[in-house]
Design a protein with these regions (language model features):
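Hard-cation-handling environments
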Residues: 169-223
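Alpha-helical transmembrane segments of multi-pass membrane proteins
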Residues: 110, 188-193, 228-230, 323-331
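Hydrophobic transmembrane alpha-helices and their helix-loop junctions in integral membrane proteins
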Residues: 1-172, 186-187, 192
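Hydrophobic alpha-helical transmembrane segments of multi-pass integral membrane proteins
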Residues: 100-101, 181-191, 316-326
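Alpha-helical transmembrane segments
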Residues: 77-88, 149-153, 156-171, 202-204, 222-250, 323-328, ...
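Alpha-helical membrane-embedded segments
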Residues: 140, 145-146, 209-232
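Aromatic-capped, Gly/Pro-kinked transmembrane alpha-helices
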Residues: 203-207, 236-332
Length: 332
């Protein structure tokens, strides 16, 4: 069971982070990053690190909530969630941009944020497992892809040039911006709170240990590559001819829906058709044939009756009546 959890979690973390890089809908891009983080959680449980899984679950909600709140203000103000229709909002919506960066830093393995400590514990757990040569690169690669996905979303919304959808984008009401900025402050203070509560160790930064440098390097690689690709003229915002098939495959969730329809749905549909055919041909056919045979037998019986039995019964009845009447009259 633990091996299955590790396999499912590792595959989910890696595949979901890859799919997120090909999404143009901001909500889908973030939802796959959520799936990737929960893949880390499954890996921690499968490796026997329940405390590590608890730390991953503890440091995740606030940064992700901050990211979603910042993106929500953008979607309300621009009436679009298509990343290709946004851009150039840093000069118009800097507060929400800072809030998004704060939430993204809280999820990345970037010291001194809480996500760095939790992912460092997971990497240490992978190094102590029975297959460190496989699990350690998987964690580092998934972290790189998550960082690249977050920077990609930021670059396509706040970087680049303005579009017709983002040309007139003003800051939202304080009823939305104030809670977002307060949550940003809470995310910044989250590692301090966890150190104060004894959840994380201060050595000298929260979560700093033997696996700190490889984890930090994977984060910087993801940030640097994604910023170089998307903060410029955004060449990857549209499919590249040489990578069009790969991008389309990832954008359609690796054709998971088509595979599901061709396997599970096809089997269920075949079984339902077989059940309908058997009910129509076997059950309804048997009952219909039995009823038809009974009606045909009754019809043939009515045609073969000659009328003699009816006359015999009438004669017998009349005889009984006459006998009864004679007995009544003959009685003194």
């Amino acid at each position: 069971v633990q091996a299955v959890l590790v396999a499912v979690g590792g595959t989910t973390a890696l595949v979901a982070s890859l799919i997120a890089l090909a999404q143009i809908d901001v909500k889908r891009a973030l939802s796959f990053l959520v799936s990737s983080w929960f893949g880390f959680l499954f890996m921690a449980v499968g490796l026997g690190g329940r405390e590590v899984a608890g730390h991953l679950l503890l440091v995740y909600p606030l940064p992700m909530a901050l990211i979603l709140m910042a993106i929500g203000t953008i979607m309300i103000g621009n009436v679009s969630q298509n990343l290709n229709q946004l851009g150039g909002l840093w000069g118009r919506r800097p507060l929400m941009g800072l809030a998004f960066l704060t939430g993204a830093a809280g999820l990345m393995a970037l010291p001194p944020f809480a996500g760095f400590a939790a992912l460092g514990e997971l990497l240490t757990l992978a190094a102590q497992s029975s297959a460190p040569a496989l699990l350690m690169p998987l964690v580092l690669l998934a972290n790189t892809l998550i960082c690249a996905g977050l920077v990609r979303v930021f670059a396509l919304i706040w970087g680049g040039t303005t579009t017709p959808f983002s040309l007139r984008s003003a800051e939202v009401l304080w009823l939305m911006s104030l809670p977002t900025m307060l949550l940003a402050g809470l995310v910044l203070h989250l590692p301090v709170l966890l150190v104060h509560l004894g959840v994380l160790d201060l050595t000298p930064l929260p979560g700093w240990g033997a696996m700190a440098w490889p984890l930090l390097l994977s984060t910087l690689v993801g940030i640097g590559v994604s910023a170089g690709l998307y903060l410029g003229d955004r060449p990857l915002a549209r499919p590249i001819p040489s990578l069009g098939g790969l991008q389309d495959w990832l954008a359609h969730d690796m054709q998971t829906e088509r595979f599901y329809h061709r396997t599970v749905v096809a089997v269920v549909l075949a079984l339902s058709r077989l059940a309908a055919w058997s009910e129509l041909r076997v059950i309804d056919g048997f009952s219909g044939s039995s009823g038809g045979a009974a009606l045909a037998g009754a019809r043939r019986l009515s045609f073969t009756t000659s009328g003699r039995s009816q006359g015999y019964a009438l004669t017998l009845l009349l005889g009984v009546l006459v006998m009864a009447a004679w007995l009544l009259v003959a009685r003194p």
